[in-house]
Amino acid sequence: MLVVDASAVAGWLLPDEGGADPATLLVEAEPIAAPWLLWAELRNILVVNERRGRIPAGIVELAVEAVEGLGIALDTAPSGPGVLALARRHRLTVYDALYLELALRARGRLATLDAALRRAAEAEGVAVV
């Protein structure tokens, strides 16, 4: 399983973000998942970038539609104690700890552009792409 965070997905969509080409990450048979939080984070990132003029008006809906087409399963059952423990151990936000907890629980890889989350995932033995 590939767990994707909002920074990775935004990197696929926004100019100059330096994200990996999704075609190199997405294996046809590999399921993709994210915590439920991705739904709000992605939309917020896109709207803020629209407001700042980084992306044209009207692109937000098209970008969301494209991401929804990837079939990302949104997880709604995180381990509360596990998330808190990861946040404390690695000094992560609870938001970032949600992504790491899902990757650990699913025994999956994690796609992120966030340096702190990358370090925490590597420390926990999670492969980062």
PLM-predicted stretches and their roles:
Residues W36-W39, I59-H90, E101:
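Acidic catalytic patch
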Residues A97:
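N-terminal active-site wall of soluble small-molecule enzyme domains
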Residues N44-R51, L104:
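Short glycine/serine- and small hydrophobic-enriched flexible loop segments
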Residues M1, W39, L92, L100-V129:
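Acidic, PIN/NYN-like endoribonuclease modules and their adjacent C-terminal/linker elements
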Residues S7, W36, G80, D114-A115:
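Alpha-helix N-cap/helix-start capping motif
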Residues A29-I32, I72, R105-R109:
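Short active-site oxyanion
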Residues M1-L37, N49-L62, E124:
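Short, well-structured N-terminal submotif of metal-dependent ribonuclease cores
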Residues P15-A20, L62, L70, D75-A77, ...:
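Contiguous, function-dense segments enriched for cysteine-driven chemistry
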